[in-house]
Amino acid sequence: MATMTSREFNQDLARAKRVARQEPVVVTDRGEPSHVLMSY
């Protein structure tokens, strides 16, 4: 599972979507997991 901070997610949504095609992306907020992005 890939991980990215909420700041990275907000600054590069295209990259997050690209990675999510291959594996779930955990988005963290202040170091704690808060959301998971997955492709459909």
Predicted regions: what is each one?
Residues 4-21:
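The conserved cystathionine-beta-synthase
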Residues 5, 26-28:
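Residues that mark the N-terminal boundary/hinge immediately upstream of a DNA-recognition element
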Residues 26, 33-40:
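Short beta->alpha transition motifs characteristic of CBS
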